[in-house]
Amino acid sequence: MCAKKYKIAALIVAAGVGSRCNSTIPKQYIKLAGKSVLFHTIKRFLANQYIDYIRIAINRDHESFYEKAISLITDTKLLSPVYGGENRQSSVKLGLESLQKINPDFVVIHDACRPFVSDVLIDNLVESMINDQYTGVVPAIEVEDTMSLVSNSFIESTISRGKLRAIQTPQIFNFKELLSCHQSVKEFTDDSSLMVEHKKHVAIIKGEKSNFKLTTKEDINMAKLLFEEPKFRVGAGYDIHKFIKVQNGAESFIKICGVKIEHNMAIEAHSDGDVAIHAIVDAILGALGCGDIGEHFPPSSSEWKDCNSSHFLDFAAKKAKEKGYSVSNLDITIVCEEPKISPYKVEMKKFISKALEIDDEFVNIKATTAEKLGYIGRNEGIAVHASVLLHTNFYWK
């Protein structure tokens, strides 16, 4: 098979107003990673080995949007646009008629709002069309959800999915055959159904789930998610607290990473003195550019007297979520002569990972001594270093 024996044009339909998307601008011009949906779609076809010409059917009122969308495209495969009509069928018809001078052997029809079409899918369509000499070939995916007939918000009956397929674009056809069919009717929402209506044989090949159409706001948000590169932020935190004698009648323990550890000394602090959580909170706030723990919970305020430090950790985690970030991983180094930390590491990891809503494998806790050097070496206190990596959240807004 040699596809280059054939002239192949792509007609991208971009004349719709996108009323279902509830957007202030037509959805084909919404930005994904700084470029319009239409730009991304055009680039897919410009890169394909079989496509010789590309024509875009646009809305007459969207000309300024279109010019901005293609301003960075210099490839001569992209022809001047044609104005579309009142509906999809009339836009396709006008687009086909504009290609008559070129007179391609085959035409590939594609929705502008399917920017995830792959090069492989375009290749498969063209090669199937040429190898098997079909009138048309379209991609289709199996219907996996239960299908029902509905009336007045109630299910009337359930439809068997066995023979059901969801038809996608791009769709490839014999150019003259498709043009003839369009010139004989007024309105069809899909080119393959138009051809079938005219008793033409249209074959299907396996489509791609990733080649979904951007129809609703939810689709747009999903597309933004897929196009957007994840963003990362790094933060470092440090805290140190002094050991003091246990007051008469008080429990003999300290708290580290939310875990009570028996010790013959107490920690001098305004809150509960969880030095590790304080370092973690500072690391998260630092990564977010939100100052430090003292700015949000000043030790001069009686409100935070003896406060459970888990409150501070919850605050930092919530602040990260508000800014669109989650903790990717956390590394903690506890420096003290006593108490021994190793017996409590598993419990500490569980506490911190639960508070941050991450798997405990992403929390690492190390402990070391100061080798009898300095104030920590003299067992006068405890210090903690914390490093955190944040990543952008992957969820639909």
UniProtKB/Swiss-Prot annotation:
Region described as 2-C-methyl-D-erythritol 2,4-cyclodiphosphate synthase: 233-397
Keywords on record: Isoprene biosynthesis, Lyase, Metal-binding, Multifunctional enzyme, Nucleotidyltransferase, Transferase
The reaction(s) this protein catalyses: 2-C-methyl-D-erythritol 4-phosphate + CTP + H(+) = 4-CDP-2-C-methyl-D-erythritol + diphosphate; 4-CDP-2-C-methyl-D-erythritol 2-phosphate = 2-C-methyl-D-erythritol 2,4-cyclic diphosphate + CMP
Record-annotated site: Transition state stabilizer: 20, 27, 270, 369
Record-listed a divalent metal cation binding positions: 239, 241, 278
GO biological process: isopentenyl diphosphate biosynthetic process, methylerythritol 4-phosphate pathway; terpenoid biosynthetic process
GO molecular function annotations of the record: 2-C-methyl-D-erythritol 2,4-cyclodiphosphate synthase activity; 2-C-methyl-D-erythritol 4-phosphate cytidylyltransferase activity; metal ion binding
Pathway assigned in UniProt: Isoprenoid biosynthesis; isopentenyl diphosphate biosynthesis via DXP pathway; isopentenyl diphosphate from 1-deoxy-D-xylulose 5-phosphate: step 2/6; Isoprenoid biosynthesis; isopentenyl diphosphate biosynthesis via DXP pathway; isopentenyl diphosphate from 1-deoxy-D-xylulose 5-phosphate: step 4/6
Site (Positions MEP for the nucleophilic attack): 161, 213
Enzyme Commission (EC) number: 2.7.7.60, 4.6.1.12
Positions of region (2-C-methyl-D-erythritol 4-phosphate cytidylyltransferase): 1-233
Family stated for the protein in its record: In the N-terminal section; belongs to the IspD/TarI cytidylyltransferase family. IspD subfamily. In the C-terminal section; belongs to the IspF family.
Name listed for the protein in its UniProt record: Bifunctional enzyme IspD/IspF
Organism for this UniProt entry: Wolbachia pipientis wMel
